[in-house]
């Protein structure tokens, strides 16, 4: 069965890559391309918007216009937009792949509650490499984390509006959980001035915003005499798009529930 797939955020940074990834995967059919209401791209052909030839699929400004044509929606928008799509998808029986970042704790709880009645893949990073790195971080934290100083450094392009990145926060969550800590209690976001001696139980975050960096993350476990660094660098957003499409295909074989890319890739356990 070919999966009817929609893209929300088709005019954004991920939009063109998602269009190309859908068109390249024989398991899916791109049946909807959604931008914000009033966007100048509404009415344009989704293929042409992605820098390809026309595919006969006009961009629409509202999910309700195409909800009967979609089995699974891939959403890379903004938190408030994703939450609106969440309600529409639940009502229409559409599965949802969420790549949006920048959610508050309360918004994340809304997503988790909605997943009790629908299938959702929610991951701040759809890259296979990043999710393999998360697995390695869990192992490293259990082996050396208790005695190491842990720092997370991330870099993205100048246009990214949330910091730290969702991926950096997820990395911090994985490390903290492996150590039996709560990230909210031990995270330090940047340092300035006279900060005093480092608290050994903290996890530090540093953020860089510059140029056109697609995404780079390094987690450092620094002990006396040695340190371990686990790094992932993305050179193209296509890796995220391919991962999102892979998640959409996987999700169609699942029931209700909240999943992440670790589930999709079989990395849990």
Curated annotation (Swiss-Prot):
Single Gene Ontology MF annotation = 4-hydroxy-tetrahydrodipicolinate reductase
The name this protein goes by in its record: 4-hydroxy-tetrahydrodipicolinate reductase
Q: What class of enzyme is it?
A: oxidoreductase
- What is a single Pfam family found in this protein's UniProt entry? DapB_N
Q: Catalytic positions?
A: 156 (proton donor/acceptor), 160 (proton donor)
Record key words, sorted:
Amino-acid biosynthesis, Cytoplasm, Diaminopimelate biosynthesis, Lysine biosynthesis, NAD, NADP, Oxidoreductase
Write out the function statement from the record. Catalyzes the conversion of 4-hydroxy-tetrahydrodipicolinate (HTPA) to tetrahydrodipicolinate.
